[in-house]
């Protein structure tokens, strides 16, 4: 009588998160923090896909790879936020237009 959570449920959640992340990048091009959070949502959706397929197929490779992706995503977020803090201290703004002005 209980509801069984299958692979399609996980894939649906991952697709929704991926879509939200993609929309966040395309609809909000002015705020760097929102873009960074949207990239993290996309990586989270990829991790959900990796873990769900890994569990469905009974193979641990996808789960190990998801841990690797989580580690790289955490490092990317930390480095990105550190760069934004330094940029804000130097320029007083973190708008995308100001960051584009840094191109040589």
From Swiss-Prot:
According to its UniProt entry, the protein's GO biological process terms are: ATP synthesis coupled electron transport
Give the EC number.
7.1.1.-
| Record's keyword annotation contains Translocase | yes
Give the residue spans that cross the bilayer: 7-27, 33-53, 67-87
Q: How does it sit in the membrane?
A: Multi-pass membrane protein
Localization: Cell inner membrane
Q: Single GO cellular component annotation?
A: NADH dehydrogenase complex
Q: List the molecular function annotations (GO) for this entry.
A: NADH:ubiquinone reductase (non-electrogenic) activity; quinone binding
Reactions mediated catalytically: a quinone + NADH + 5 H(+)(in) = a quinol + NAD(+) + 4 H(+)(out)
Classification via Pfam families: Oxidored_q2 (PF00420)
Can the keyword Cell membrane be found in this entry's annotation?
A: yes
Which family does the UniProt entry place this protein in?
Belongs to the complex I subunit 4L family.
Give the record's subunit note.
NDH-1 is composed of 14 different subunits. Subunits NuoA, H, J, K, L, M, N constitute the membrane sector of the complex.
Name of the protein in its database record: NADH-quinone oxidoreductase subunit K
- Organism listed in the record: Xanthobacter autotrophicus (strain ATCC BAA-1158 / Py2)
Q: Which gene encodes it?
A: nuoK
